[in-house]
Amino acid sequence: MAAGVPCALVTSCSSAFSGDQLVQHILGTEDLIVELTSNDAVRFYPWTIDNKYYSADINLCVVPNKFLVTAEIAESVQAFVVYFDGTQKSGLDSVSSWLPLAEAWLPEVMILVCDRVSEDGINRQKAQEWCIKHGFELVELSPEELPEEDDDFPESTGVKRIVQALNANVWSNVVMKNDRNQGFSLLNSLTGTNHSIGSADPCHPEQPHLPAADRTESLSDHRGGASNTTDAQVDSIVDPMLDLDIQELASLTTGGGDVENFERLFSKLKEMKDKAATLPHEQRKVHAEKVAKAFWMAIGGDRDEIEGLSSDEEH
């Protein structure tokens, strides 16, 4: 593995579906290129993420079990994708054994994948409760219920959602593209579809790119079971510099599309993400909610549209 290349660690806790198969789905090909390693059990699949905002060279690192995770791999993990068998009542037990490592890595993207949830094994409620507790997003490869065709904001599902989440992550070696004047859309992509800035919505059903107002509303959707948090607690948790950070972020997002502006926007997002990563898990969610609300106000959003939103609301 090339030094300094970030990775999305992919593993499977099911004997019927391997991590390599999941990588095939993500890359959309069965003809995979694998980097040679000293340990044949661990495989690195190079992947260049290339979208309209940035490009980044990463590895999809397939690790069959947690005992094969080396210090080098641990240092490079920036996303964690784990597959489990939803038809087995004990399907989440093996996944839970990875939690100490995931908590040490604190990756911004953590996805729990299954073919589909099952009433005879792990049902949707149990899977989502587990996700909420541990900061994951649930993705079904073959969901029983698909989004309505006439939905104004159809949800991404299956492998498409996994690819979308990995594209939305701010990878450490990201290279900005300088020919785009879409700062606000960039922020939507980076903070509205995944767990950037502190896992604000750990187990929402697969979520599309939303306008700012809808995105802010969605922070409180599908969050049953989150702990009660008062405004005073929020204010005591966040960094005193947060308000200044928000104002700068808003200015960069609504400003011009020159290269320097984009680079500063990415730098500020990375800086805020790193700050949030130092907080305990529950505080990270509260921090992310405050960031979303404050940002909405900073760009001129209507307070009425987000009034009353908090992490203890249930829908």
Curated annotation (Swiss-Prot):
Gene Ontology biological-process entries: protein transport
Region annotated Disordered, chain positions: 197-233
Positions where Phosphoserine occurs in the chain: S310, S311
Keyword field: Cytoplasm, Phosphoprotein, Protein transport, Transport
Coiled-coil ranges from the UniProt annotation: none
Keyword ATP-binding set for record: no
Signal peptide span: none
Keyword Phosphoprotein assigned: yes
Comp. bias regions, Basic and acidic residues: 203-224
Subcellular location: Cytoplasm, Cytosol
Superkingdom field: Eukaryota
GO cellular component, one term: cytosol
Role this protein plays: May be involved in endocytic recycling of growth factor receptors such as EGFR.
Record PANTHER family: ALPHA- AND GAMMA-ADAPTIN-BINDING PROTEIN P34
Complex and partners: Associated with AP-1 and AP-2 complexes.
Name of the protein described by the UniProt record: Alpha- and gamma-adaptin-binding protein p34
